[in-house]
């Protein structure tokens, strides 16, 4: 049983159960193997030399075919990696098609497409990453329609600029042209 807290605050924290430590820790860790209380320095099975660590440890084996991580439990007989992988291969959960993640089809782009960074092109219907979402960035097959819409947009911008009287008077340098009478005025 761990000694709890101090005389002033008996419910605050606990002392480490390791014999050579006995440090008062205000956020102690309870070991799920041996049931003792330990400080942050001795919280792992290896750090406090837990006798029941083998019962509580978790190990996984990664399937080369589908990329899944299969947990190997000590209570299941333990088995070696080959037996665990063989059982996984016989199950219906092993699907080699899942291992290969979709990638952006743009040459030299190595971006993996996920739900949050995938954009579908309206011109060609290709799924590309966000860096290549514009038709000019991914050599869109429907770029002819994109070029026509760009030309239409430029024509509309030119019409709206021509309708505004102020824009017609604007100089190339960015300033406004003053009427001749104001330019000749002298200020004393």
Curated annotation (Swiss-Prot):
Keyword Repeat: yes
Residues the record lists as binding Zn(2+) 1: 16, 21, 39, 42
SUPFAM superfamilies from the UniProt entry: AN1-like Zinc finger (SSF118310)
Binding site for Zn(2+) 3: 104, 109, 129, 132
Keywords, alphabetical: Metal-binding, Repeat, Stress response, Zinc, Zinc-finger
Zinc finger (AN1-type) stretch: 10-58, 98-148
UniProt protein name: Zinc finger AN1 domain-containing stress-associated protein 17
Native source species: Oryza sativa subsp. japonica
Gene: SAP17
């Amino acid at each position: 049983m761990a000694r709890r807290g101090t005389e002033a605050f008996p419910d605050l924290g606990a002392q480490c159960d390791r014999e050579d430590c006995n440090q008062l820790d205000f956020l102690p860790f309870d070991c799920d193997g041996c049931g003792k209380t330990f400080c942050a320095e001795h919280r792992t099975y290896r750090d406090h030399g837990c006798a029941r660590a083998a019962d509580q440890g978790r190990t996984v084996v990664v399937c080369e075919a589908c990329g899944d991580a299969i947990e190997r439990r000590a209570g299941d007989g333990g088995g070696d990696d080959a037996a665990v992988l063989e059982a996984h291969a016989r199950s219906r959960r092993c699907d080699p098609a899942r291992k290969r993640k979709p990638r952006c089809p743009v040459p030299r782009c190595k971006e993996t497409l996920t739900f949050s960074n995938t954009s579908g092109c309206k011109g060609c219907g290709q799924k590309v990453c966000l860096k290549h979402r514009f038709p000019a960035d991914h050599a869109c097959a429907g770029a002819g329609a994109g070029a026509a819409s760009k030309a239409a947009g430029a024509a509309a911008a030119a019409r709206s600029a021509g309708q505004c009287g102020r824009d017609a008077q604007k100089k190339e340098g960015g300033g406004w042209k003053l009427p001749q009478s104001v330019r000749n005025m002298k200020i004393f």
